[in-house]
Amino acid sequence: MKKLEDVGVLVARILMPILFITAGWGKITGYAGTQQYMEAMGVPGFMLPLVILLEFGGGLAILFGFLTRTTALFTAGFTLLTAFLFHSNFAEGVNSLMFMKNLTISGGFLLLAITGPGAYSIDRLLNKKW
């Protein structure tokens, strides 16, 4: 059963960061527009490199199982924060769905922070007791 669990965690680690890696890449390639949008929403533009680091870098870290527990905690917190900053105006149609999506994603990352990266991960290779 342990092997099935490890494969399941690996599949989750592959699926969960897809949104973050693609969103981070979009922010890299559309830096100026993203910075303007953030500032229009009241978030200082100087925060964008940190957002990119968390989305793109954190997404890759989760994908490969590197610093998984810590990255998953930061990503869960970031996702909750973005839910409240960018999706809490439920009068705008899709925001309630986006808000709930972010809550769900945060739950997945919290679960990953608790369970760890599984056997098929860089963390496992670096430290046998993940």
Curated annotation (Swiss-Prot):
Cytoplasm recorded as keyword: no
For this protein, the record's InterPro entries field holds: DoxX, DoxX-like_oxidoreductase
* Membrane topology category: Multi-pass membrane protein
Query: What is the protein name stated in its UniProt record?
Result: Inner membrane protein YqjF
| Pfam families in UniProt | DoxX
> Where does it reside?
Cell inner membrane
Q: Which residue ranges does the entry give as Cytoplasmic-facing topology?
A: 1-5, 67-70, 123-130
Domain of life assignment: Bacteria
Q: Which residues cross the membrane?
A: 6-26, 46-66, 71-91, 102-122
Q: Which gene encodes it?
A: yqjF
Question: Where, in residue ranges, is this chain on the Periplasmic side?
Answer: 27-45, 92-101
Q: Could you say which protein family the record assigns here?
A: Belongs to the DoxX family.
Coiled coil residues, start to end? none
Record's keyword terms, sorted? Cell inner membrane, Cell membrane, Membrane, Transmembrane, Transmembrane helix
Q: Name one GO cellular component term.
A: plasma membrane
